[in-house]
């Protein structure tokens, strides 16, 4: 510590406690004399009042620090609690969506006349269910066979016919395949060579 009360570049708190009253006394005398560069008005500031305010601020600062720390701790806890709550809500919503999906599926089945007739005919009997499904398979196979036959008939009717022979047995074009006009031009407007 040096002569000015500075320890390692800082001001000691005891020295500061001595300097503050001296500074305020100097400020008060400058204010009363009017010789100071800054005139503070007519209100006198007492050192005791300022020291009392400083003590109150010193009491408030630890409270604010504790509040800040508790907010920092609780923020992490609250965020994890919020995350857990959101995950639980998502699980509940997923379950609800599955329930709604199943309810929709059951509703569609109850509106389906084929399903209702299946349920009436089988009444939960495994043998009857097998027989009913086999009869439906036979119906489907019969319908597929009929569709295939009809497609074959339509395909045969729509198939292009083989073109008539335009060449003779020797491969020479037949003479009647072009019609010529007088003057040696064909119907299409081309001249024939003679």
Swiss-Prot record:
One of its GO terms (biological process) is cell division. One of its GO terms (cellular component) is microtubule. It is found in: Nucleus; Cytoplasm, Cytoskeleton, Spindle pole; Chromosome, Centromere, Kinetochore. Residues 151-194 are annotated as: Disordered. The keyword Signal does not apply. Keywords: Cell cycle, Cell division, Centromere, Chromosome, Chromosome partition, Coiled coil, Cytoplasm, Cytoskeleton, Kinetochore, Microtubule, Mitosis, Nucleus. The keyword Transmembrane helix does not apply. It comes from the Eukaryota. Pfam families: DASH_Duo1. Residues 127-156 form a coiled coil. Belongs to the DASH complex DUO1 family. Component of the DASH complex consisting of ASK1, DAD1, DAD2, DAD3, DAD4, DAM1, DUO1, HSK3, SPC19 and SPC34, with a stoichiometry of one copy of each subunit per complex. Multiple DASH complexes oligomerize to form a ring that encircles spindle microtubules and organizes the rod-like NDC80 complexes of the outer kinetochore. DASH complex oligomerization strengthens microtubule attachments. On cytoplasmic microtubules, DASH complexes appear to form patches instead of rings. Within the complex, DAM1 and DUO1 may form the microtubule connections. Component of the DASH complex that connects microtubules with kinetochores and couples microtubule depolymerisation to chromosome movement; it is involved in retrieving kinetochores to the spindle poles before their re-orientation on the spindle in early mitosis and allows microtubule depolymerization to pull chromosomes apart and resist detachment during anaphase. This is DASH complex subunit DUO1. It comes from Eremothecium gossypii (strain ATCC 10895 / CBS 109.51 / FGSC 9923 / NRRL Y-1056) (Yeast).
């Amino acid at each position: 510590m040096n002569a000015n009360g500075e320890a390692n570049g800082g001001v000691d708190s005891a020295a500061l406690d001595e300097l503050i009253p001296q500074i305020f006394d100097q400020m008060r005398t400058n204010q009363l004399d009017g010789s100071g560069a800054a005139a503070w008005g007519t209100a006198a500031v007492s050192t005791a009042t300022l020291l009392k305010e400083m003590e109150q601020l010193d009491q408030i600062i630890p409270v604010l620090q504790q509040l800040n720390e508790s907010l920092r701790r609780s923020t992490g806890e609250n965020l994890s609690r919020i995350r857990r709550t959101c995950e639980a809500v998502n699980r509940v919503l997923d379950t609800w969506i599955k329930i709604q999906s199943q309810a929709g599926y059951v509703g569609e089945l109850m509106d389906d006349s084929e399903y209702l007739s299946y349920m009436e005919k089988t009444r939960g009997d495994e043998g009857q269910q097998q027989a009913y499904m086999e009869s439906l398979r036979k119906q489907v196979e019969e319908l597929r066979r009929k569709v295939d036959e009809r497609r074959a008939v339509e395909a045969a009717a729509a198939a292009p016919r083989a073109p008539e022979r335009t060449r003779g047995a020797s491969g020479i074009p037949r003479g009647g395949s072009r019609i010529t006009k007088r003057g040696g031009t064909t119907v299409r407007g081309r001249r024939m060579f003679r």
